[in-house]
Design a protein with these regions (language model features):
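Structured, helix-rich domain cores that form ligand/interaction pockets
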Residues: 1-156
């Protein structure tokens, strides 16, 4: 163990691999949160995502014609910074034109976190709903950002 004031560095050996663990602050000075999510659902509708994954009513969303570059979506359901892009064009690979693209920016993640938390749910519960409803082969994450905010007087 190396101790330099309040910063302590521990050296551990585990299964022959040397790992360094550096403790530079305490948990009370850090906050960690999900800051951006994007998920593609291969066989879903906007209504299904909104009602069964986000657990929100569809009538609070505004619907706009919108396109995403390099995607076949033609409409976007939106409330605040939560977006569900839908209405994929029918193609040979997708004859029913199904599929959605769920995006939550930082504020959208904060909003859905508050909603989940008020119902005693977590993001993990929401992700498990995705798995239960669509199976592992019918949805995938395209982006999942984590933000770590350091609230120390002196940042590390």
């Amino acid at each position: 163990m190396i101790n330099k004031g309040k910063n302590t560095i521990f050296t551990r050996k585990k299964r022959g691999i040397r790992k360094e663990q550096c403790t530079i602050t305490t948990h009370k000075n850090l906050s960690v949160k999900i800051d951006y999510i994007s998920i593609v659902f291969e066989t879903a509708t906007a209504e299904d995502i909104i009602m069964h994954i986000l657990d929100l009513p569809t009538d609070i969303f505004n619907v706009y014609p919108a396109m995403i570059k390099f995607k076949t979506y033609q409409a976007r359901w939106q409330i605040g910074d939560i977006y569900v892009s839908v209405d994929a064009r029918k193609t040979e690979d997708n004859p029913q034109g199904l599929g959605c693209y769920l995006v939550m920016t930082g504020r959208g993640c904060d909003d859905i976190f508050r909603i989940l938390d008020s119902r005693n749910y977590t993001f993990g519960d929401m992700f498990r709903r995705c798995e239960r409803r669509y199976g592992l082969d019918n949805f995938h994450f395209t982006r999942l950002d984590i933000a770590i905010d350091d609230k120390n007087e002196k940042s590390y």
